[in-house]
């Protein structure tokens, strides 16, 4: 997982944080020296509680008549949170608010595809 996280952080200086949860395993890494960063405990609960719930709800809605769910993009005050479902969990990436985040979504997805986490 370290190579995947390294690749995602190297994609752009606008990638603030990467978290990968698969089953009970959660790996988080934050870029050093961030302004407006969340606390480590807050990030942990977001990955264990908030993002899985968000993905469950939006996946169920997407499966009704919207063609499923590819990802969720949340705009918090200090950053964007890009959350993708993967087998047994999610990949969550915080992006700087100045970033044209939509432009980073496809390169992020391509890296996850190379690591066989999304199709």
Short names for language-model regions:
Residues 1-119:
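Non-catalytic interaction/Regulatory regions outside core domains
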């Amino acid at each position: 997982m370290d190579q995947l996280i390294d690749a995602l952080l190297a994609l752009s200086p606008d990638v603030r944080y990467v978290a990968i949860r698969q089953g009970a395993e959660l790996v988080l890494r934050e870029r050093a020296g961030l302004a407006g960063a969340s606390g480590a405990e807050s990030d942990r609960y977001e990955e264990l509680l908030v993002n899985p719930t968000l993905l469950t709800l939006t996946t169920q809605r997407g499966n009704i008549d919207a063609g499923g769910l590819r990802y969720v993009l949340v705009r918090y005050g200090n950053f964007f949170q890009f959350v993708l479902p993967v087998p047994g969990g999610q990949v969550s990436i915080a992006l700087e608010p100045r970033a044209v985040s939509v432009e980073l979504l496809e390169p992020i997805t391509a890296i996850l595809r190379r690591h066989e986490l999304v199709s």
